[in-house]
Amino acid sequence: MIQALLVTICLVGFPHQGSSIILESGNVKDYEVVYPQKIPALPKGGIQRAEPETKYEDTMQYQFKVNGEPVVLHLERNKGLFSEDYSETHYSPDGREITTSPPVQDHCYYHGRIQNDADSTASISACNGLKGRFKHQGETYLIEPLKISDSEAHKIYKSENLEKEDEAPKTCGVTQTSLETDETIKMNFQSANNPEEDYVRKRKYIKLAVVVDNSMYIKYDRNLNDIRSRIYEIVNDVNVFYRLLNIHIALIFIEIWSHQDKINVQPMVRVTLDSFGTWRETDLLPRRSHDNAQLYTNVDFDGPTVGYAYVGSLCKPKHSVAIIQDHTETANMMASTVAHELGHNLGMNHDSGNCICQPTLCVMSETLSSVPFNDFSACSRVDHRNYLIRDLPQCILNKPLRTDIVAPAVCGNNFVEVGGECDCGSPQDCQSTCCDAATCRLRDGAQCDTEECCEQCRFRRAGTVCRAAKDDCDVAEFCTGRTADCPMDGLQRNGEPCQHNQGYCYNGKCPIMTNQCIALWGPDATVSQDGCFHFNENGQGDLYCRRENGVNIQCEPQDNKCGRLFCVQSTSTVQCNYRSSATDPDYGMVAIGTKCGDGRVCNNNRFCVDIRIAY
Protein backbone atom coordinates (compact mmCIF):
# COMPACT_ATOMS: atom_id res chain seq x y z
CA MET A 1 0.00 0.00 0.00
CA ILE A 2 2.79 2.41 0.86
CA GLN A 3 4.61 1.64 -2.36
CA ALA A 4 1.46 2.31 -4.33
CA LEU A 5 1.08 5.59 -2.52
CA LEU A 6 4.55 6.64 -3.55
CA VAL A 7 3.73 5.93 -7.16
CA THR A 8 0.32 7.54 -7.36
CA ILE A 9 0.90 10.80 -5.48
CA CYS A 10 1.92 13.33 -8.12
CA LEU A 11 3.11 16.88 -7.69
CA VAL A 12 3.00 19.66 -10.21
CA GLY A 13 6.22 21.66 -10.38
CA PHE A 14 6.30 25.15 -11.81
CA PRO A 15 9.74 25.66 -13.29
CA HIS A 16 10.71 29.28 -13.54
CA GLN A 17 13.85 30.09 -15.48
CA GLY A 18 15.69 33.19 -16.53
CA SER A 19 15.06 35.67 -13.70
CA SER A 20 16.37 36.33 -10.23
CA ILE A 21 14.75 36.51 -6.85
CA ILE A 22 16.09 37.53 -3.45
CA LEU A 23 16.05 34.60 -1.05
CA GLU A 24 17.55 34.13 2.39
CA SER A 25 20.61 32.82 0.59
CA GLY A 26 21.04 35.82 -1.71
CA ASN A 27 20.64 36.12 -5.49
CA VAL A 28 19.72 32.99 -7.40
CA LYS A 29 19.90 32.99 -11.19
CA ASP A 30 18.01 29.82 -12.15
CA TYR A 31 15.57 27.99 -9.96
CA GLU A 32 12.57 25.70 -9.99
CA VAL A 33 9.41 26.28 -7.97
CA VAL A 34 8.08 23.10 -6.34
CA TYR A 35 5.42 22.18 -3.83
CA PRO A 36 6.79 19.45 -1.52
CA GLN A 37 4.05 17.09 -0.43
CA LYS A 38 4.41 15.14 2.77
CA ILE A 39 3.86 11.40 2.40
CA PRO A 40 2.27 9.65 5.38
CA ALA A 41 4.33 6.69 6.50
CA LEU A 42 3.55 3.69 8.68
CA PRO A 43 6.12 1.75 10.68
CA LYS A 44 7.15 -1.76 9.72
CA GLY A 45 4.19 -4.09 9.68
CA GLY A 46 1.77 -1.28 8.89
CA ILE A 47 0.74 -0.78 12.53
CA GLN A 48 0.67 2.78 13.82
CA ARG A 49 2.22 2.88 17.29
CA ALA A 50 1.31 5.51 19.84
CA GLU A 51 4.22 7.95 20.07
CA PRO A 52 4.94 10.59 22.71
CA GLU A 53 3.45 13.91 21.70
CA THR A 54 6.08 15.91 19.82
CA LYS A 55 6.02 18.89 17.52
CA TYR A 56 8.30 17.29 14.95
CA GLU A 57 8.31 13.68 13.80
CA ASP A 58 11.34 11.41 14.00
CA THR A 59 11.02 10.43 10.34
CA MET A 60 9.33 12.15 7.41
CA GLN A 61 9.06 11.75 3.65
CA TYR A 62 8.41 14.43 1.04
CA GLN A 63 7.87 14.16 -2.67
CA PHE A 64 8.66 16.93 -5.15
CA LYS A 65 10.22 17.36 -8.57
CA VAL A 66 13.84 17.96 -9.50
CA ASN A 67 14.41 18.90 -13.12
CA GLY A 68 10.87 17.80 -13.82
CA GLU A 69 11.38 14.30 -12.38
CA PRO A 70 9.66 13.22 -9.14
CA VAL A 71 11.90 12.34 -6.21
CA VAL A 72 11.15 11.20 -2.66
CA LEU A 73 13.20 12.75 0.14
CA HIS A 74 13.52 10.55 3.25
CA LEU A 75 14.34 12.47 6.44
CA GLU A 76 15.39 11.24 9.88
CA ARG A 77 15.76 13.58 12.81
CA ASN A 78 19.40 14.06 13.82
CA LYS A 79 18.96 12.72 17.35
CA GLY A 80 22.61 13.23 18.17
CA LEU A 81 22.70 16.92 17.23
CA PHE A 82 22.70 18.02 20.88
CA SER A 83 24.52 16.50 23.81
CA GLU A 84 22.50 15.35 26.80
CA ASP A 85 23.76 18.26 28.90
CA TYR A 86 23.39 20.95 26.24
CA SER A 87 23.20 24.49 27.60
CA GLU A 88 23.36 28.10 26.42
CA THR A 89 24.91 31.18 27.99
CA HIS A 90 24.39 34.84 27.19
CA TYR A 91 24.88 38.02 29.20
CA SER A 92 22.52 40.68 30.53
CA PRO A 93 23.06 44.39 29.69
CA ASP A 94 24.92 44.79 32.99
CA GLY A 95 27.17 41.81 32.25
CA ARG A 96 25.53 39.12 34.40
CA GLU A 97 25.92 35.57 33.09
CA ILE A 98 22.61 33.89 32.17
CA THR A 99 22.81 30.14 31.55
CA THR A 100 19.84 27.98 30.57
CA SER A 101 19.30 24.38 29.51
CA PRO A 102 16.54 24.67 26.90
CA PRO A 103 14.61 21.58 25.80
CA VAL A 104 16.13 20.73 22.43
CA GLN A 105 15.30 17.07 21.90
CA ASP A 106 12.12 17.88 19.97
CA HIS A 107 14.02 19.82 17.33
CA CYS A 108 13.50 20.21 13.58
CA TYR A 109 16.90 19.35 12.06
CA TYR A 110 17.17 16.28 9.85
CA HIS A 111 19.54 14.18 7.80
CA GLY A 112 18.29 12.15 4.89
CA ARG A 113 18.62 10.77 1.40
CA ILE A 114 16.83 10.59 -1.93
CA GLN A 115 15.00 7.33 -2.55
CA ASN A 116 16.77 5.00 -5.03
CA ASP A 117 19.95 7.10 -5.04
CA ALA A 118 22.58 5.29 -2.97
CA ASP A 119 25.05 8.19 -3.18
CA SER A 120 22.57 10.83 -2.05
CA THR A 121 22.72 12.82 1.19
CA ALA A 122 20.59 15.55 2.73
CA SER A 123 20.83 18.09 5.52
CA ILE A 124 17.49 19.79 6.08
CA SER A 125 15.87 22.17 8.55
CA ALA A 126 12.12 21.53 8.72
CA CYS A 127 11.36 24.29 11.23
CA ASN A 128 9.53 26.51 8.75
CA GLY A 129 9.21 24.60 5.52
CA LEU A 130 12.18 22.70 4.10
CA LYS A 131 15.51 24.52 4.04
CA GLY A 132 18.94 23.05 3.38
CA ARG A 133 20.81 21.05 0.80
CA PHE A 134 20.68 17.60 -0.76
CA LYS A 135 22.87 15.67 -3.16
CA HIS A 136 21.13 13.87 -6.01
CA GLN A 137 22.74 12.10 -8.97
CA GLY A 138 26.07 13.75 -8.19
CA GLU A 139 24.67 17.30 -8.12
CA THR A 140 24.22 19.48 -5.03
CA TYR A 141 20.88 21.29 -4.74
CA LEU A 142 19.59 23.82 -2.24
CA ILE A 143 15.97 24.10 -1.20
CA GLU A 144 14.21 26.79 0.79
CA PRO A 145 10.72 28.24 1.18
CA LEU A 146 9.73 30.87 -1.36
CA LYS A 147 8.61 33.88 0.65
CA ILE A 148 5.42 34.69 -1.19
CA SER A 149 1.78 34.46 -0.24
CA ASP A 150 1.72 30.77 -1.21
CA SER A 151 3.27 29.26 1.90
CA GLU A 152 3.69 25.82 0.27
CA ALA A 153 5.95 27.01 -2.54
CA HIS A 154 9.65 26.19 -2.33
CA LYS A 155 12.58 27.02 -4.53
CA ILE A 156 15.13 24.44 -5.67
CA TYR A 157 18.33 25.40 -7.43
CA LYS A 158 21.76 23.98 -8.10
CA SER A 159 24.39 25.34 -5.77
CA GLU A 160 26.42 26.81 -8.63
CA ASN A 161 23.42 28.99 -9.54
CA LEU A 162 23.86 30.93 -6.33
CA GLU A 163 25.51 34.17 -7.36
CA LYS A 164 28.65 35.05 -5.47
CA GLU A 165 28.04 37.60 -2.73
CA ASP A 166 31.58 38.92 -3.20
CA GLU A 167 33.85 38.55 -6.21
CA ALA A 168 36.94 38.20 -4.02
CA PRO A 169 37.76 34.52 -3.34
CA LYS A 170 37.58 33.44 0.28
CA THR A 171 40.43 31.46 1.78
CA CYS A 172 41.58 29.74 4.94
CA GLY A 173 44.54 31.39 6.65
CA VAL A 174 46.24 28.17 7.76
CA THR A 175 49.74 27.72 6.36
CA GLN A 176 51.47 25.40 8.83
CA THR A 177 51.24 21.64 8.38
CA SER A 178 50.97 20.70 12.04
CA LEU A 179 50.83 22.20 15.51
CA GLU A 180 54.27 20.84 16.22
CA THR A 181 56.88 19.26 14.00
CA ASP A 182 55.74 16.37 11.86
CA GLU A 183 56.90 13.04 13.18
CA THR A 184 57.63 10.00 11.05
CA ILE A 185 55.18 7.28 11.95
CA LYS A 186 57.23 4.17 12.61
CA MET A 187 54.63 1.57 13.37
CA ASN A 188 53.87 -1.83 11.92
CA PHE A 189 50.26 -2.13 10.78
CA GLN A 190 50.44 -5.60 9.30
CA SER A 191 48.33 -7.04 12.11
CA ALA A 192 44.61 -6.47 11.83
CA ASN A 193 44.48 -6.51 15.63
CA ASN A 194 46.97 -3.66 16.05
CA PRO A 195 45.65 -1.30 18.79
CA GLU A 196 46.30 1.77 16.63
CA GLU A 197 44.28 0.25 13.80
CA ASP A 198 41.50 -0.49 16.28
CA TYR A 199 41.59 3.13 17.38
CA VAL A 200 41.28 4.38 13.80
CA ARG A 201 38.23 2.18 13.20
CA LYS A 202 36.37 3.34 16.30
CA ARG A 203 33.46 5.73 16.02
CA LYS A 204 34.49 9.18 17.25
CA TYR A 205 32.39 11.80 19.07
CA ILE A 206 33.24 15.51 19.20
CA LYS A 207 31.46 17.66 21.77
CA LEU A 208 31.41 21.08 20.12
CA ALA A 209 31.13 24.44 21.87
CA VAL A 210 30.24 27.46 19.72
CA VAL A 211 31.01 31.00 20.91
CA VAL A 212 29.37 33.98 19.17
CA ASP A 213 31.11 37.32 19.60
CA ASN A 214 29.43 40.69 20.05
CA SER A 215 29.81 41.74 16.41
CA MET A 216 27.82 38.71 15.23
CA TYR A 217 25.25 39.29 17.98
CA ILE A 218 24.74 42.81 16.62
CA LYS A 219 24.70 41.55 13.00
CA TYR A 220 21.63 39.43 13.78
CA ASP A 221 19.84 42.37 15.42
CA ARG A 222 20.55 41.02 18.91
CA ASN A 223 18.03 38.23 18.24
CA LEU A 224 19.10 35.17 20.25
CA ASN A 225 16.61 32.89 18.48
CA ASP A 226 17.95 33.79 15.02
CA ILE A 227 21.51 33.13 16.17
CA ARG A 228 20.56 29.78 17.69
CA SER A 229 18.74 28.69 14.54
CA ARG A 230 21.72 29.58 12.37
CA ILE A 231 24.13 27.63 14.56
CA TYR A 232 21.81 24.61 14.72
CA GLU A 233 21.52 24.55 10.93
CA ILE A 234 25.29 24.87 10.48
CA VAL A 235 26.18 22.10 12.94
CA ASN A 236 23.51 19.80 11.51
CA ASP A 237 25.11 20.20 8.08
CA VAL A 238 28.65 19.74 9.40
CA ASN A 239 27.53 16.36 10.74
CA VAL A 240 26.82 15.19 7.18
CA PHE A 241 30.46 15.82 6.23
CA TYR A 242 31.90 14.01 9.22
CA ARG A 243 29.69 10.94 8.96
CA LEU A 244 31.99 10.12 6.03
CA LEU A 245 34.84 9.77 8.56
CA ASN A 246 32.78 7.93 11.21
CA ILE A 247 32.77 11.05 13.40
CA HIS A 248 29.68 12.42 15.11
CA ILE A 249 29.48 16.10 16.10
CA ALA A 250 27.30 16.90 19.13
CA LEU A 251 26.58 20.52 20.03
CA ILE A 252 27.15 20.78 23.78
CA PHE A 253 27.19 24.51 24.41
CA ILE A 254 26.55 27.93 22.89
CA GLU A 255 27.89 31.11 24.45
CA ILE A 256 26.82 34.47 23.05
CA TRP A 257 28.80 37.55 24.06
CA SER A 258 25.71 39.73 24.14
CA HIS A 259 27.20 42.26 26.59
CA GLN A 260 30.77 42.63 25.38
CA ASP A 261 33.56 40.49 23.99
CA LYS A 262 35.64 38.39 26.38
CA ILE A 263 38.72 38.80 24.18
CA ASN A 264 39.89 41.36 21.65
CA VAL A 265 38.49 39.98 18.37
CA GLN A 266 40.57 41.67 15.69
CA PRO A 267 41.31 41.23 11.96
CA MET A 268 44.73 39.63 12.62
CA VAL A 269 43.74 35.97 12.72
CA ARG A 270 46.88 34.68 14.42
CA VAL A 271 46.42 37.04 17.36
CA THR A 272 42.68 36.38 17.63
CA LEU A 273 43.12 32.60 17.47
CA ASP A 274 45.82 32.73 20.15
CA SER A 275 43.62 34.88 22.40
CA PHE A 276 40.60 32.64 21.90
CA GLY A 277 42.65 29.53 22.68
CA THR A 278 43.94 31.07 25.89
CA TRP A 279 40.41 32.14 26.92
CA ARG A 280 39.11 28.67 26.16
CA GLU A 281 41.81 27.04 28.29
CA THR A 282 41.57 29.40 31.26
CA ASP A 283 37.89 30.40 31.28
CA LEU A 284 35.61 28.17 29.23
CA LEU A 285 37.07 24.71 29.87
CA PRO A 286 37.07 25.01 33.69
CA ARG A 287 33.33 25.73 33.67
CA ARG A 288 32.14 23.71 30.64
CA SER A 289 33.66 20.42 29.52
CA HIS A 290 33.90 20.00 25.74
CA ASP A 291 36.27 18.71 23.06
CA ASN A 292 36.49 21.58 20.58
CA ALA A 293 35.49 25.25 20.56
CA GLN A 294 34.79 27.56 17.62
CA LEU A 295 34.43 31.34 17.63
CA TYR A 296 32.00 32.84 15.08
CA THR A 297 32.43 36.54 14.37
CA ASN A 298 31.35 39.29 12.00
CA VAL A 299 34.78 40.94 12.22
CA ASP A 300 36.32 41.11 8.74
CA PHE A 301 39.60 39.23 8.92
CA ASP A 302 42.64 40.58 7.09
CA GLY A 303 42.71 39.89 3.35
CA PRO A 304 40.53 37.11 1.92
CA THR A 305 40.84 34.95 5.06
CA VAL A 306 37.55 33.77 6.62
CA GLY A 307 38.82 31.00 8.89
CA TYR A 308 41.84 29.95 10.91
CA ALA A 309 42.67 26.96 13.12
CA TYR A 310 45.49 24.98 14.64
CA VAL A 311 46.43 21.77 12.81
CA GLY A 312 46.37 18.42 14.62
CA SER A 313 45.24 19.88 17.92
CA LEU A 314 42.05 18.15 19.06
CA CYS A 315 41.74 17.53 22.82
CA LYS A 316 44.51 20.06 23.57
CA PRO A 317 43.27 22.68 26.07
CA LYS A 318 44.53 25.77 24.28
CA HIS A 319 44.75 24.58 20.69
CA SER A 320 41.53 22.62 20.05
CA VAL A 321 39.96 25.80 18.65
CA ALA A 322 39.10 27.61 15.41
CA ILE A 323 37.87 31.08 14.48
CA ILE A 324 35.43 31.63 11.61
CA GLN A 325 34.11 34.78 10.00
CA ASP A 326 30.35 34.75 9.32
CA HIS A 327 31.12 35.51 5.68
CA THR A 328 27.99 34.33 3.88
CA GLU A 329 24.23 34.40 4.30
CA THR A 330 24.02 30.78 3.18
CA ALA A 331 24.18 28.46 6.20
CA ASN A 332 25.37 25.55 4.05
CA MET A 333 28.35 27.60 2.86
CA MET A 334 29.16 28.52 6.46
CA ALA A 335 28.97 24.81 7.30
CA SER A 336 31.59 24.13 4.62
CA THR A 337 33.93 26.63 6.28
CA VAL A 338 33.23 25.21 9.76
CA ALA A 339 33.89 21.67 8.50
CA HIS A 340 37.12 22.87 6.87
CA GLU A 341 38.52 24.48 10.03
CA LEU A 342 37.53 21.48 12.15
CA GLY A 343 39.37 19.36 9.59
CA HIS A 344 42.55 21.24 10.45
CA ASN A 345 42.04 20.46 14.15
CA LEU A 346 41.69 16.81 13.07
CA GLY A 347 45.08 16.82 11.38
CA MET A 348 44.15 17.65 7.79
CA ASN A 349 46.23 20.01 5.67
CA HIS A 350 45.12 21.94 2.61
CA ASP A 351 44.65 19.87 -0.51
CA SER A 352 47.35 20.13 -3.14
CA GLY A 353 46.72 20.11 -6.88
CA ASN A 354 46.72 16.31 -6.96
CA CYS A 355 43.88 16.05 -4.44
CA ILE A 356 40.58 16.34 -6.29
CA CYS A 357 36.89 15.79 -5.67
CA GLN A 358 34.23 15.73 -8.36
CA PRO A 359 32.23 17.70 -9.30
CA THR A 360 33.14 20.36 -6.69
CA LEU A 361 36.17 21.29 -4.62
CA CYS A 362 37.12 19.14 -1.64
CA VAL A 363 36.40 20.14 1.95
CA MET A 364 40.07 20.97 2.58
CA SER A 365 40.59 23.13 -0.50
CA GLU A 366 42.42 26.31 0.54
CA THR A 367 40.10 28.46 -1.58
CA LEU A 368 36.44 28.29 -0.67
CA SER A 369 34.11 27.60 -3.57
CA SER A 370 30.73 29.27 -4.05
CA VAL A 371 29.42 25.69 -4.11
CA PRO A 372 29.11 23.74 -0.82
CA PHE A 373 31.66 20.97 -0.52
CA ASN A 374 30.61 17.33 -0.66
CA ASP A 375 33.55 15.17 0.38
CA PHE A 376 37.05 14.85 1.77
CA SER A 377 39.86 14.05 -0.65
CA ALA A 378 41.98 10.93 -0.39
CA CYS A 379 44.81 13.23 0.77
CA SER A 380 42.69 14.56 3.65
CA ARG A 381 41.76 11.04 4.70
CA VAL A 382 45.44 10.06 4.81
CA ASP A 383 46.31 13.21 6.81
CA HIS A 384 43.51 12.46 9.26
CA ARG A 385 44.45 8.82 9.63
CA ASN A 386 48.12 9.67 10.23
CA TYR A 387 47.12 12.24 12.85
CA LEU A 388 44.92 9.73 14.68
CA ILE A 389 47.69 7.12 14.70
CA ARG A 390 50.33 9.62 15.83
CA ASP A 391 48.36 11.42 18.56
CA LEU A 392 45.59 8.96 19.50
CA PRO A 393 43.40 11.82 20.84
CA GLN A 394 41.35 10.28 23.62
CA CYS A 395 38.62 12.86 24.25
CA ILE A 396 36.81 11.95 21.03
CA LEU A 397 36.32 8.34 22.11
CA ASN A 398 33.99 9.40 24.92
CA LYS A 399 30.61 8.44 23.56
CA PRO A 400 27.52 9.31 25.61
CA LEU A 401 26.68 6.92 28.44
CA ARG A 402 23.44 4.99 28.07
CA THR A 403 21.91 6.92 30.94
CA ASP A 404 23.02 10.24 29.45
CA ILE A 405 20.82 9.98 26.37
CA VAL A 406 17.52 11.64 27.19
CA ALA A 407 15.81 11.09 23.84
CA PRO A 408 13.51 8.04 23.62
CA ALA A 409 15.43 4.85 22.91
CA VAL A 410 15.67 4.34 19.16
CA CYS A 411 17.17 1.32 17.45
CA GLY A 412 19.29 2.34 14.49
CA ASN A 413 20.75 5.69 15.63
CA ASN A 414 24.27 4.33 16.39
CA PHE A 415 23.80 5.00 20.13
CA VAL A 416 23.38 2.17 22.65
CA GLU A 417 20.65 3.30 25.02
CA VAL A 418 19.30 1.66 28.16
CA GLY A 419 17.78 -1.69 27.21
CA GLY A 420 19.88 -2.08 24.06
CA GLU A 421 22.88 -4.35 23.68
CA CYS A 422 24.31 -2.84 20.51
CA ASP A 423 23.40 -0.40 17.75
CA CYS A 424 25.05 -0.56 14.34
CA GLY A 425 22.76 1.91 12.58
CA SER A 426 19.97 1.19 10.16
CA PRO A 427 19.70 -2.24 8.49
CA GLN A 428 20.93 -0.61 5.27
CA ASP A 429 24.01 0.91 6.94
CA CYS A 430 24.88 -1.80 9.47
CA GLN A 431 28.17 -3.58 8.79
CA SER A 432 28.38 -5.52 12.04
CA THR A 433 28.33 -9.31 12.12
CA CYS A 434 27.70 -9.26 15.88
CA CYS A 435 24.66 -6.98 16.11
CA ASP A 436 21.14 -7.50 14.74
CA ALA A 437 20.28 -4.10 13.26
CA ALA A 438 16.54 -4.78 13.41
CA THR A 439 16.45 -5.45 17.17
CA CYS A 440 19.68 -3.87 18.48
CA ARG A 441 20.41 -7.18 20.21
CA LEU A 442 23.59 -9.22 19.97
CA ARG A 443 23.32 -12.16 17.63
CA ASP A 444 23.30 -15.69 19.06
CA GLY A 445 26.69 -16.54 20.51
CA ALA A 446 27.98 -12.97 20.43
CA GLN A 447 29.33 -11.42 23.63
CA CYS A 448 30.03 -7.96 22.27
CA ASP A 449 30.10 -5.80 19.16
CA THR A 450 32.46 -2.87 18.53
CA GLU A 451 34.14 -2.22 21.87
CA GLU A 452 37.92 -2.05 22.27
CA CYS A 453 38.17 -5.49 23.89
CA CYS A 454 35.89 -7.22 21.40
CA GLU A 455 37.23 -9.37 18.59
CA GLN A 456 35.00 -11.38 16.26
CA CYS A 457 32.09 -10.89 18.66
CA ARG A 458 33.97 -12.36 21.66
CA PHE A 459 35.83 -10.79 24.60
CA ARG A 460 39.53 -10.50 23.93
CA ARG A 461 41.75 -12.55 26.21
CA ALA A 462 43.09 -10.95 29.37
CA GLY A 463 46.35 -9.10 28.86
CA THR A 464 45.65 -8.05 25.27
CA VAL A 465 46.70 -4.45 24.68
CA CYS A 466 43.59 -2.39 23.94
CA ARG A 467 45.19 1.06 24.10
CA ALA A 468 48.89 1.28 23.37
CA ALA A 469 51.16 3.75 25.13
CA LYS A 470 51.61 6.53 22.58
CA ASP A 471 54.82 7.91 24.12
CA ASP A 472 57.01 7.92 27.23
CA CYS A 473 54.40 9.74 29.30
CA ASP A 474 51.51 7.41 28.51
CA VAL A 475 50.84 3.89 29.74
CA ALA A 476 49.23 0.99 27.93
CA GLU A 477 45.85 -0.42 28.94
CA PHE A 478 44.98 -4.11 28.76
CA CYS A 479 41.77 -6.09 28.33
CA THR A 480 40.54 -7.95 31.41
CA GLY A 481 38.95 -10.86 29.55
CA ARG A 482 35.69 -10.23 31.43
CA THR A 483 34.32 -7.21 29.58
CA ALA A 484 34.40 -5.66 26.12
CA ASP A 485 35.41 -2.22 27.39
CA CYS A 486 39.01 -1.06 27.62
CA PRO A 487 39.95 0.24 31.10
CA MET A 488 40.04 4.00 31.65
CA ASP A 489 42.95 5.75 29.99
CA GLY A 490 45.88 6.31 32.34
CA LEU A 491 49.05 8.41 32.25
CA GLN A 492 52.61 7.97 33.41
CA ARG A 493 53.36 9.49 36.83
CA ASN A 494 54.42 13.13 36.85
CA GLY A 495 58.18 13.36 37.24
CA GLU A 496 59.10 10.18 35.34
CA PRO A 497 62.04 10.76 32.92
CA CYS A 498 61.11 11.00 29.23
CA GLN A 499 62.62 11.71 25.81
CA HIS A 500 65.93 10.04 26.71
CA ASN A 501 66.12 11.95 29.99
CA GLN A 502 65.72 15.33 28.27
CA GLY A 503 62.62 15.99 30.36
CA TYR A 504 60.15 14.73 32.94
CA CYS A 505 56.53 13.72 32.38
CA TYR A 506 53.90 16.30 33.29
CA ASN A 507 50.18 15.56 32.88
CA GLY A 508 50.83 13.07 30.09
CA LYS A 509 53.27 15.26 28.15
CA CYS A 510 57.06 15.54 28.01
CA PRO A 511 57.70 19.30 27.94
CA ILE A 512 61.24 20.02 26.77
CA MET A 513 62.60 23.38 25.67
CA THR A 514 63.77 22.19 22.24
CA ASN A 515 60.26 21.20 21.16
CA GLN A 516 58.88 24.46 22.54
CA CYS A 517 61.40 26.43 20.44
CA ILE A 518 60.44 24.45 17.34
CA ALA A 519 56.76 25.18 17.96
CA LEU A 520 57.52 28.92 18.25
CA TRP A 521 60.18 29.36 15.58
CA GLY A 522 60.12 26.41 13.20
CA PRO A 523 62.00 23.15 12.63
CA ASP A 524 65.49 24.72 12.55
CA ALA A 525 65.16 26.27 16.03
CA THR A 526 66.91 25.11 19.17
CA VAL A 527 67.43 26.40 22.72
CA SER A 528 69.71 29.42 23.19
CA GLN A 529 72.86 29.30 25.28
CA ASP A 530 72.48 29.64 29.05
CA GLY A 531 73.64 33.25 29.04
CA CYS A 532 70.45 34.40 27.29
CA PHE A 533 68.31 33.30 30.23
CA HIS A 534 70.01 35.82 32.54
CA PHE A 535 67.84 38.48 30.87
CA ASN A 536 64.89 37.02 32.83
CA GLU A 537 66.55 38.28 36.02
CA ASN A 538 65.90 41.90 34.96
CA GLY A 539 62.11 41.83 35.26
CA GLN A 540 61.86 44.44 32.51
CA GLY A 541 59.43 44.43 29.58
CA ASP A 542 58.64 40.84 28.59
CA LEU A 543 61.54 39.34 30.54
CA TYR A 544 60.43 37.99 33.91
CA CYS A 545 59.31 34.84 35.70
CA ARG A 546 55.74 35.78 36.59
CA ARG A 547 53.35 38.67 37.04
CA GLU A 548 51.64 39.50 40.34
CA ASN A 549 48.90 42.15 40.40
CA GLY A 550 50.11 43.46 37.05
CA VAL A 551 53.72 43.80 38.20
CA ASN A 552 56.62 41.88 36.63
CA ILE A 553 58.53 39.71 39.10
CA GLN A 554 62.06 39.02 37.92
CA CYS A 555 63.54 35.54 38.10
CA GLU A 556 66.04 34.62 40.74
CA PRO A 557 69.23 33.26 39.14
CA GLN A 558 68.31 29.66 39.97
CA ASP A 559 64.86 30.13 38.37
CA ASN A 560 65.81 31.95 35.17
CA LYS A 561 65.01 28.94 32.96
CA CYS A 562 61.39 29.07 34.13
CA GLY A 563 60.70 32.52 32.66
CA ARG A 564 60.83 33.66 29.04
CA LEU A 565 62.06 30.99 26.59
CA PHE A 566 65.06 31.94 24.45
CA CYS A 567 65.70 30.21 21.15
CA VAL A 568 68.16 30.43 18.27
CA GLN A 569 67.63 29.62 14.59
CA SER A 570 70.32 28.16 12.38
CA THR A 571 69.63 30.82 9.74
CA SER A 572 69.87 33.76 12.15
CA THR A 573 72.80 35.59 13.70
CA VAL A 574 70.69 36.64 16.69
CA GLN A 575 71.44 34.28 19.57
CA CYS A 576 68.71 35.27 22.05
CA ASN A 577 65.31 35.25 20.31
CA TYR A 578 62.06 35.26 22.26
CA ARG A 579 58.35 35.70 21.53
CA SER A 580 55.59 37.38 23.54
CA SER A 581 51.95 38.37 23.15
CA ALA A 582 50.08 41.38 24.48
CA THR A 583 46.95 39.27 24.94
CA ASP A 584 48.46 36.01 26.24
CA PRO A 585 50.95 36.39 29.11
CA ASP A 586 51.99 32.72 28.88
CA TYR A 587 52.84 32.83 25.18
CA GLY A 588 56.59 32.38 24.74
CA MET A 589 57.19 31.40 28.37
CA VAL A 590 58.87 28.14 29.37
CA ALA A 591 56.08 25.58 29.84
CA ILE A 592 55.15 24.37 33.31
CA GLY A 593 56.78 21.00 34.05
CA THR A 594 59.83 21.71 31.85
CA LYS A 595 63.21 20.43 33.03
CA CYS A 596 65.28 23.35 34.34
CA GLY A 597 68.19 21.36 35.76
CA ASP A 598 69.14 17.83 36.73
CA GLY A 599 66.27 16.49 38.83
CA ARG A 600 64.50 19.87 38.75
CA VAL A 601 61.40 21.23 36.96
CA CYS A 602 59.48 24.51 36.63
CA ASN A 603 56.44 24.47 38.92
CA ASN A 604 53.19 26.43 38.60
CA ASN A 605 54.76 29.48 40.25
CA ARG A 606 57.75 29.33 37.87
CA PHE A 607 60.25 28.29 40.49
CA CYS A 608 62.84 25.69 39.50
CA VAL A 609 62.23 23.06 42.19
CA ASP A 610 63.37 19.56 43.06
CA ILE A 611 61.36 16.93 41.18
CA ARG A 612 60.70 15.13 44.46
CA ILE A 613 58.62 18.02 45.83
CA ALA A 614 57.18 19.36 42.57
CA TYR A 615 54.11 17.11 42.38
UniProtKB/Swiss-Prot annotation:
Give the highest taxon in the source lineage.
Eukaryota
Q: What keywords are annotated for this sequence in UniProt?
A: Calcium, Disulfide bond, Hemostasis impairing toxin, Hydrolase, Metal-binding, Metalloprotease, Platelet aggregation activating toxin, Protease, Secreted, Signal, Toxin, Zinc, Zymogen
What are the BP-aspect GO terms? proteolysis
> Where would you say this protein principally sits, based on its record?
secreted
Give the positions the UniProt entry annotates as the active site: 341
The cross-references to InterPro entries, in alphabetical order and at most eight, read: ADAM_Cys-rich, Disintegrin_dom, Disintegrin_dom_sf, MetalloPept_cat_dom_sf, Peptidase_M12B, Peptidase_M12B_N, Reprolysin_adamalysin
| Enzyme class of the recorded protein, top EC level | hydrolase
Q: How is the cofactor bound?
A: Binds 1 zinc ion per subunit.
Q: In which tissues is it expressed?
A: Expressed by the venom gland.
What family classification does the UniProt entry report for this protein?
A: Belongs to the venom metalloproteinase (M12B) family. P-III subfamily. P-IIIa sub-subfamily.
Record protein name field: Zinc metalloproteinase-disintegrin-like
Ranked from the top, the taxonomy reads: Eukaryota, Metazoa, Chordata, Craniata, Vertebrata
